């Protein structure tokens, strides 16, 4: 199966999570105009008994294409955000929430440089 990689936007990604972007969102200059603050970009969700929010940094290796999708994973108790630390684009492969991933509903999205994504809890995705 080959997937077409879609250009991401807030609407077409909404069933999987949120696009993280500073474009066209409310911002405010703070700290005597030395910093621009962008508010309320994502909804971090923590479910279950372990109600701690953790921030991790992952260093991913560049993938070779065509990419063989041989597994999907999900995180049943929390959302998961990916925001590149360098100017780079990346591709995410996702499937809607279900008990097991529906291979007929897999979608791929290209995330532009300087943007990120936040997977909702239980959304299936290929590991980055």
Give each language-model segment a name:
Residues 82, 125-128:
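Short beta-strand His + acidic residue motifs that chelate non-heme Fe in jelly-roll/DSBH
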């Amino acid at each position: 199966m080959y997937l077409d990689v879609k250009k991401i936007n807030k609407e077409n990604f909404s069933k999987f999570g949120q696009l993280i972007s500073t474009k066209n969102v409310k911002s405010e200059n703070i700290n005597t105009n030395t910093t621009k603050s962008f508010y309320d970009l994502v909804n971090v969700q923590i479910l279950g008994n372990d109600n701690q929010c953790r921030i991790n940094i992952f260093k991913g290796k560049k993938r070779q294409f065509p990419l063989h999708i041989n597994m999907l994973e999900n995180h049943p108790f929390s959302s998961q955000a990916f925001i590149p630390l360098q100017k780079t684009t990346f591709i995410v492969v996702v499937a809607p929430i279900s008990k097991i991933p529906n291979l007929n509903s897999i979608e791929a999205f290209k995330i532009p440089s300087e943007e990120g994504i936040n997977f909702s809890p239980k959304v299936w995705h290929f590991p980055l």
